[in-house]
Amino acid sequence: MAKSPRRVAGRRLLLPLLCLFFQGATAILFAIFVRYDQQTDAALWHGGNHSNADNEFYFRYPSFQDVHAMVFVGFGFLMVFLQRYGYSSLGFTFLLGAFALQWATLVQGFLHSFHGGHIHVGMESLINADFCAGAVLISFGAVLGKTGPAQLLLMALLEVALFGLNEFVLLCLLGVRDAGGSMTIHTFGAYFGLVLSRVLYRPHLEKSQHRQGSVYHSDLFAMIGTIFLWIFWPSFNSALTSRGDGQPRTALNTYYSLTASTLSTFALSALVGKDGRLDMVHVQNAALAGGVVVGTASEMMLTPFGALAAGCLAGAISTLGYKFFTPILESKLKIQDTCGVHNLHGMPGVLGALLGALMTGLTTHEAYGDGLQSVFPLIAEGQRSATSQAIYQLFGLSVTLLFASAGGVLGGLLLKLPFLDAPPDSQCYEDQMCWEVPGEHGYEAQEALRVEEPDTEA
Amino acid sequence: MAKSPRRVAGRRLLLPLLCLFFQGATAILFAIFVRYDQQTDAALWHGGNHSNADNEFYFRYPSFQDVHAMVFVGFGFLMVFLQRYGYSSLGFTFLLGAFALQWATLVQGFLHSFHGGHIHVGMESLINADFCAGAVLISFGAVLGKTGPAQLLLMALLEVALFGLNEFVLLCLLGVRDAGGSMTIHTFGAYFGLVLSRVLYRPHLEKSQHRQGSVYHSDLFAMIGTIFLWIFWPSFNSALTSRGDGQPRTALNTYYSLTASTLSTFALSALVGKDGRLDMVHVQNAALAGGVVVGTASEMMLTPFGALAAGCLAGAISTLGYKFFTPILESKLKIQDTCGVHNLHGMPGVLGALLGALMTGLTTHEAYGDGLQSVFPLIAEGQRSATSQAIYQLFGLSVTLLFASAGGVLGGLLLKLPFLDAPPDSQCYEDQMCWEVPGEHGYEAQEALRVEEPDTEA
Amino acid sequence: MAKSPRRVAGRRLLLPLLCLFFQGATAILFAIFVRYDQQTDAALWHGGNHSNADNEFYFRYPSFQDVHAMVFVGFGFLMVFLQRYGYSSLGFTFLLGAFALQWATLVQGFLHSFHGGHIHVGMESLINADFCAGAVLISFGAVLGKTGPAQLLLMALLEVALFGLNEFVLLCLLGVRDAGGSMTIHTFGAYFGLVLSRVLYRPHLEKSQHRQGSVYHSDLFAMIGTIFLWIFWPSFNSALTSRGDGQPRTALNTYYSLTASTLSTFALSALVGKDGRLDMVHVQNAALAGGVVVGTASEMMLTPFGALAAGCLAGAISTLGYKFFTPILESKLKIQDTCGVHNLHGMPGVLGALLGALMTGLTTHEAYGDGLQSVFPLIAEGQRSATSQAIYQLFGLSVTLLFASAGGVLGGLLLKLPFLDAPPDSQCYEDQMCWEVPGEHGYEAQEALRVEEPDTEA
């Protein structure tokens, strides 16, 4: 509890300096490189020959807002389940997310839309940046409660760069399809975070064990996150799929997959629960696995039945993961996975990549007709067979796992830098480390109430 | 408290088996019957001659997402007002809703869009399935806290089938108009639930009375539900009304009606409250009656004034219902209506059906011009006079009340099956029946805190 | 605590009578004056020659729903941070908002769209009414906890009228640009509320000081408000900007500005916090200043860098305002600003107006091309130079400050009317004044638990 004055002074300056330095650096890079794209710039748009209704905005904006809500409301509140870590869960989600959006704009811009010395940003950039922020927040879930904000900012710095690189290799170099990011977002974010958590392994974390669970209200707050993720996931997967049939098909597949993962989660949770009781952790997380598992395949001709089957399987695996695999992960593999991202994003993400490869291999010209061009342009143009595209999909998964693991190791070593002010083992999962905390746990407001009480009794 | 081992074993298997059986059955039926519709299928869409912007998706998707949010966030959190039943309220909303979406897709598909041996699903199917899930959750509100999850799944099984049948009779056979579902959703859902609750009457429910109220925080959670329902209701009523003028008119009428029901709710709540105090129950529920009461009429030329008048009346009746009618309902009619669905959905739903009939009877060619075709095709085509259409509307209300009541009786008898594991009278409104519950009410986390305290004092 | 029976009787009638009178009056005015506009009326729409996709609804509705969510979910929950005032914060937001929407429709209708003896309402009217309700809720933030519902309704009555007038002078008479309302909404709402709070100065407010802070859970509820405001702010600023490039550019600028204000808020909060700790009040509020500061300039060619710079500055100023300026505001200027609206809406609003004037002065034909017409029609048509338009912008700010201050004084005097039942100094920030409050603070539910306990122990 007692801190050296120097350490306190260090912390006082560390976070402000990092924030201001990062903000300053991205602002300078924005000034030099970032410009409005043709849909967003007044002169360029009006120079073109199109009706206002053709603007990308009207095809993407409602989905963008849903994705934005998922990243900040969804991931943010999902992590409020911890009893004394709600400020940090929401606050650091906010901080990491905001930084990731700026930095991802630059990284993705340099790799995807750098023309004539400039990055051109528009609706798609915003959605892509939100996707990247989503991956960062998935990794945050693995190390939640055991890392300080300065560590997390450095994690985001590294992860966004590697995310952009991995995405570039998959989508641009390998021609892999991954509209909803089973690989690029979920698998990458999960294994990056898990490997990082392994490097940061804390053998004496049991000192904070009493804060690692939820309380009644914190579980209700977490359900805000769950439900917003669940309802908006169809927008997440379809935000960048092709206009016309692509967006509704993706949304519809995701919708049905999620209903199935919900049913299988309840079934398995009751089956493995003590006295047949349901477990809130399963409902909060595993019910969402249906969205992850169709991240790659939902834009394909998966069929509504295929969506149900995939969701059902993902919900079951995820629930069993929480029950049986998470404890082993900690005891045997020394991976402390606070939110169970391995169960929600890791395994369902890999499963989603495999499902995507399977659906790709089964692609026929009959099933897609003239729509093949927008889902599998390389097959439609005769450059690849369905089988070879499927092999590329599997190769994309391997590349992702490689990037994520290497990044996690690198990130872990980076975060071990001693001046980054990691919380001690006994102060994990505790908002007081970084926040002024009022009431209920014995602070100002509580004091005031204590002072008041004698008056009432007198 | 003490349970026979056999009962526990039964429960352990009952819910998993039901979930898996239902999921398996719908999956098989999906595999056989459900196909993408022309807007969603790659080959069919690209075979047609249309621009991508014509896809139904761009006219319906934002409204669909709002409806989806209302059903899961809105209805879910609205029921969290009970102090010890938040997990169940949110969890069973999730479970029932997910199952209802799948099952409604099949039932509505067989009745509405079964062509060439297949059900064709697209944006409208998703919205219709959400509407049906909404009706199931209204019924859930009537029996909240007094039923287990297995009972609720069976209720949903029956209710979805009857909902689809009633909807088919009204919209397809009788040619009744009911865009926002004053009859098909609210009246049906409410009276189905109320009659079912009557059949399940518990004379000794006072044993759980101390859990039947709210606590401070649970009321704030419930307000999440209220406000999301309130803001998105314009989308609920307009999600399936005609393109062009139909959607904005419906949304606008609903918007104004809700402002009026809010004002009249506050007025009446303070008027009948102890010492002029406002009651959160009224604000959480009756303020929404304005959305219900224009469910039928909001697509019509109701005029903004008509919307205000209807909303004002609905808010007042609903508030008075909570104050004076709910107690009578329990004491005289033996209907225990946990959420007061009779006040929010029952009476305003019937009132909405009557308002719809009135507006229908007042329809003129002058008021609608060439727009008459899309609101009242049968009148526009000269097959019916306005008066005869109005009589059909009233007949639709009667049919709905009949289906709902018969369904409620049937459902009540079904849910009385002894192996369905209903909670005992003393354990109603209690999450512990079905959930692992941490903290605050004396479980693990609390234990940990107690252990910790001596350390702090030492 | 003891009240005279007459006072209680007065209160019992005051709020109901005000609500019903206001509702009755607006309903009558709606009946006489308000009609559907050409996009919403069946006959008028079908009389025109356009495709359904041209309807304003499809360009504005998704943004409208986001704005609606911001006003009721965002502003509502943001004010739940007070430990014992959650019912009032949410309930009065609801009441004031609903009344403001109706009354603003009339006021703005008379001033902006009164043709042929009628006000014509459609999508834009709904958005404009929501904007006005937003301003009323900003003022509510300044007097939160110190005013009763009857006082607040009268405040809304006056403020909506003056808001409409100020907006009319700026947008219609002076030709000022202010799409996201840095002046018309934020500056106006903040200074109206602050001056009003000054007139209502309570020298003995410390009697309620122990209720003026937050508790752990109330801060989490407030974050619901913060995050929904943050994610949907791009829709707020772009809801009424021009079709085509205008809406995406405005949304994009707002998005980046908010990321920057979030980073600078965290930096400054940690810098000025005790032991380098972060303060939830800053994160809840100052992180949003980026949305306010680009309210005027976001539709202009601000550039992504400009958005970052503006947001960064606004977040920093707002955080420093909470830390250093709010205490002075109370001690020296006798302005008790409950939510710190001066920091979130006042200073960033004025800054936003200045930024707007700067960007206006820098306008060139090259930067906007043919798009100049839709952002600065008077410059495009040659009626004004960029400099003279910039001077008009500054003049608009002065007019706004004048209207707001005069309105605040007038409002303060009005709210001092003794029969309006203001809460006594010792009962401020306390829900019990106006609401039936259960549990946790020693009411019914708590009683029930006490009764139960002996049974358990016996």
Swiss-Prot record, chains A, B, C:
Catalytic activity: NH4(+)(in) = NH4(+)(out); methylamine(out) = methylamine(in); CO2(out) = CO2(in)
Domain of life, per lineage: Eukaryota
Keywords noted in UniProt: Ammonia transport, Cell membrane, Glycoprotein, Membrane, Transmembrane, Transmembrane helix, Transport
Pfam family, one: Ammonium_transp
Recorded topology in the membrane: Multi-pass membrane protein
Main location: membrane
Annotated localization: Cell membrane; Basolateral cell membrane
PTM section of the record: N-glycosylated.
Interaction with ANK3, as annotated region: 416-424
Entry's transmembrane regions: 14-34, 62-82, 87-107, 125-145, 150-170, 179-201, 220-240, 252-272, 283-303, 305-325, 347-367, 394-414
Family matches, as Gene3D superfamilies: Ammonium transporter AmtB like domains (1.10.3430.10)
Cytoplasmic compartment spans: 1-13, 83-86, 146-149, 202-219, 273-282, 326-346, 415-458
GO BP annotations listed: ammonium homeostasis; ammonium transmembrane transport; transepithelial ammonium transport
Residues carrying covalently attached carbohydrate according to the record: N49
One GO cellular component term: spectrin-associated cytoskeleton
Intervals, Extracellular compartment: 35-61, 108-124, 171-178, 241-251, 304, 368-393
Basolateral sorting signal, short sequence motif: residues: 429-432
GO MF annotation, one: ammonium channel activity
Function: Ammonium transporter involved in the maintenance of acid-base homeostasis. Transports ammonium and its related derivative methylammonium across the basolateral plasma membrane of epithelial cells likely contributing to renal transepithelial ammonia transport and ammonia metabolism. May transport either NH4(+) or NH3 ammonia species predominantly mediating an electrogenic NH4(+) transport. May act as a CO2 channel providing for renal acid secretion.
Subunit structure as annotated in this protein's UniProt entry: Interacts (via C-terminus) with ANK2 and ANK3; required for targeting to the basolateral membrane.
Protein family: Belongs to the ammonium transporter (TC 2.A.49) family. Rh subfamily.
The protein's name in its UniProt record: Ammonium transporter Rh type B
Naturally occurring in which organism (per UniProt): Oryctolagus cuniculus
